[in-house]
Amino acid sequence: MSHRDTLFSAPIARLGDWTFDERVAEVFPDMIQRSVPGYSNIISMIGMLAERFVQPGTQVYDLGCSLGAATLSVRRNIHHDNCKIIAIDNSPAMIERCSRHIDAYKAPTPVDVIEGDIRDIAIENASMVVLNFTLQFLEPSERQALLDKIYQGLNPGGALVLSEKFSFEDAKVGELLFNMHHDFKRANGYSELEISQKRSMLENVMLTDSVETHKARLHKAGFEHSELWFQCFNFGSLVALKAEDAA
């Protein structure tokens, strides 16, 4: 059962850095729906992409799986035999709830739910990899290495879905979309205090990049094709494709 997010409705004397702890995990479904514009669309479309890209006898990786929404969307759209999904997150609270969610929905495709660091897991025989609002929580200096590893672990013709909050090289556009996102949160019932306190906790741990920076990293990793396929305000998702004739 999901609870309503009221974590920041009262003043907090000492705001530390953001963590995905038990309190956040408990309200996460409500929090993300009210905070991330287009989240439900992205989750649904990840399933549609899975239907196109997941191949028989291959693996799908959900890196930073949180409560398993993307994993479940992928699994509902796998219609091949001998596939497996590996869902990994470093938050014990998220993983505990993710396991319960996965177990509640029976399907032929097995899911390995792993508590661990996405930087340490091997990517092998992958037809699809999902990074759904995960890369932005890694140190910027570590992001290229992860994308390189993903590219190497993808089979030819495989796909990476990379969803992120974006910054913008055009400051005027960035300011507009930032303000529209805050309007979105206000419309969903968040107060100015809640918005301000959450932003203060996130500012040191969620470091955003521009779409151009993401595309440059993907190209450097070896992806022959990448494009923004979804955007709402300063949130969006890219798909990057490994060529079918890649070595």
Swiss-Prot record:
Keywords assigned: S-adenosyl-L-methionine, Transferase
Name of the molecule in the record: Carboxy-S-adenosyl-L-methionine synthase
Q: What class of enzyme is it?
A: transferase
Q: Which family does it belong to?
A: Belongs to the class I-like SAM-binding methyltransferase superfamily. Cx-SAM synthase family.
Alphabetical list of InterPro entries matching this protein: CmoA (IPR005271), Methyltransf_25 (IPR041698), SAM-dependent_MTases_sf (IPR029063)
List of residues binding S-adenosyl-L-methionine = Y39, G64, C65, S66, D89, N90, D117, I118, N132, R199
State the Pfam families in the record: Methyltransf_25
Complex formation: Homodimer.
What organism does this protein naturally occur in? Shigella sonnei (strain Ss046)
Which GO terms of type biological process are on file? tRNA wobble uridine modification
Q: Which reaction does it catalyse?
A: prephenate + S-adenosyl-L-methionine = carboxy-S-adenosyl-L-methionine + 3-phenylpyruvate + H2O
Annotated GO molecular function terms are: carboxyl- or carbamoyltransferase activity; S-adenosyl-L-methionine binding
Q: What is its EC number?
A: 2.1.3.-
- Report the protein's function: Catalyzes the conversion of S-adenosyl-L-methionine (SAM) to carboxy-S-adenosyl-L-methionine (Cx-SAM).
HAMAP family referenced in this protein's UniProt entry, alphabetically: Cx_SAM_synthase
